[in-house]
């Protein structure tokens, strides 16, 4: 089942584990060819833990590429544009902790 994300992109699945006023924990599933497009958050840090993969988290300014195998993690601080996808367009599944702060999704072209 495809689901619409809050950033208006389609992903294979989203399970909300916990959500409060300034913290969210979710499990996201990306099917082959899907991604979380380039965006940033004004106030929150995204902390990723790969559950199934490999997966890739790319950032701009600083330009980095994090290749994560299951069990590995990385964090992207506020105001850092990032893009998430499975390696070579493959499927992946990850836990994401978003906070502490008010959630927003600012697309980046």
Question: Which functions belong to the PLM regions below?
Answer:
Residues 21-22, 43, 62, 89-90:
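Short strand-connecting beta-turns/loops that link adjacent beta-strands
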């Amino acid at each position: 089942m495809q689901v619409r994300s809050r950033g208006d992109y389609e992903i294979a699945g989203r399970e909300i584990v916990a959500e409060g006023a300034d913290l969210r924990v979710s499990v996201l599933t990306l099917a082959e060819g899907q991604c979380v497009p380039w965006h940033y958050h004004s106030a929150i840090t995204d902390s990723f833990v790969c559950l199934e993969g490999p997966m890739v988290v790319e950032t701009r300014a600083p330009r980095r590429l994090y290749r994560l195998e299951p069990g590995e993690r990385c964090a992207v601080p506020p105001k850092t544009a990032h893009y998430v996808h499975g390696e070579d367009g493959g499927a992946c599944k990850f836990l994401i902790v978003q906070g502490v702060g008010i959630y927003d999704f600012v697309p980046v072209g």
